[in-house]
């Protein structure tokens, strides 16, 4: 009986101590620096990201067009048109084949976007500004994006991100603000 009474006292005291312990409703971040820089990144650039952007690049064997629409709620819609052709030799003469869509990497897609400051490679990677993109083609079979690309900047006319599928000579893509249709 005495043991039971002792346990009740210990349990009551533990409950009293726990009820008096202060709990903070403020979250504690595993990486406060990354959190602060993510907040600052979003305050500076997220409002500028909202809207529609387009990019087109045409070469001898490849032509690529992409349009992205970023919404304030973190959703993303887009469309991609990508065509390729080959340089072949026929009868001793070089000529290009007809343009062909690069299936399944063409069509409309929907998904989500987010700006963050972190290292996509994990603990050993260098932290940097990234644009996280996750999107599936509307037919649901393939991903249009499931990646983190380096984010350069956004302003009134330009969105600069690291090239993923196609890129300019410097490794970046400069999207232009506004809706457009592919020239091909």
Where are these regions (language model features)?
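Contiguous, well-ordered beta-strand patches that form the walls/edges
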Residues: 58-63, 81-160, 167
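Structural signal for glycine-centered tight turns and loop->strand junctions in beta-sheet-rich domains
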Residues: 72-76
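Bacterial N-terminal signal peptides that target proteins for export
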Residues: 2-11
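Short, low-complexity, Pro/Ser/Thr/Gly-rich segments in the mature regions of secreted, periplasmic
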Residues: 170-184
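Bacterial signal peptide processing site
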Residues: 24-27
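N-terminal helix-cap/turn-to-beta initiation motif at the start of protein domains
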Residues: 32-54, 69
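C-terminal motif of bacterial Sec signal peptides marking the signal peptidase cleavage site
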Residues: 19-22
């Amino acid at each position: 009986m005495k043991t039971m009474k002792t346990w009740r006292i210990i349990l009551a005291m533990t409950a009293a101590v726990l009820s008096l312990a202060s709990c903070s409703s403020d979250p504690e971040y595993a990486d406060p620096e990354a959190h602060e820089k993510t907040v600052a990144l979003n305050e500076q650039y997220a409002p500028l990201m909202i809207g529609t952007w387009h990019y087109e690049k045409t070469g001898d064997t490849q032509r690529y067009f992409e349009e992205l629409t970023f919404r304030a709620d973190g959703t993303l819609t887009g469309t991609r048109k990508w065509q390729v052709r080959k340089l072949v030799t026929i009868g001793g003469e070089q000529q290009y084949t007809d343009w062909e869509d690069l299936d399944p990497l063409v069509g409309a897609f929907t998904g989500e976007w987010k700006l963050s400051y972190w290292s996509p490679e994990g603990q050993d990677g260098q932290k940097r500004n990234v644009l996280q993109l996750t999107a599936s083609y509307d037919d649901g079979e393939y991903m249009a994006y499931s990646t983190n690309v380096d984010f350069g900047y956004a302003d009134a006319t330009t969105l600069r991100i690291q090239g993923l599928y196609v890129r300019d000579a410097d490794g970046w893509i400069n999207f232009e603000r506004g809706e457009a249709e592919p020239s091909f």
